[in-house]
Amino acid sequence: MPKRKAKGDAKGDKAKVKDEPQRRSARLSAKPAPPKPEPRPKKASAKKGEKLPKGRKGKADAGKDGNNPAKNRDASTLQSQKAEGTGDAK
């Protein structure tokens, strides 16, 4: 089977050798390329000195508030005290 001639090897016969059109779909050429989304910033990693023990992740923040009704006293007494306190403050 004969090999295809390169474009530069044409010997003056412009009628026989035509420039092949670039084959690109009309659908693709009609709309521009979509813009790339901006990269999201990465989360800052925790500093080496601030690591907590593995078992204390959730419990460390709960103790800082000091007004956790489930820990200090039951919720019903806390709500009743709030209701009484609102009537006194005039």
UniProtKB/Swiss-Prot annotation:
GO cellular component terms attached to this protein's record: chromatin; nucleus
PANTHER family in alphabetical order: HIGH MOBILITY GROUP NUCLEOSOME-BINDING DOMAIN-CONTAINING PROTEIN 4, NONHISTONE CHROMOSOMAL PROTEIN HMG
Residues with Phosphoserine modification: S80
UniProt KW keywords: Acetylation, ADP-ribosylation, DNA-binding, Nucleus, Phosphoprotein
Segments of skewed composition (Basic and acidic residues): 7-23, 37-64
Localization annotation: Nucleus
Gene Ontology molecular function terms on file: chromatin binding; nucleosomal DNA binding
Main localization (coarse): nucleus
Residue(s) carrying ADP-ribosylserine: S29
Stretches for region Disordered: 1-90
Annotated GO biological process: chromatin organization
Species this protein is from: Homo sapiens (Human)
Family: Belongs to the HMGN family.
Protein known as: High mobility group nucleosome-binding domain-containing protein 4
Pfam families reported for this sequence: HMG14_17
Modified residues (N6-acetyllysine): K82
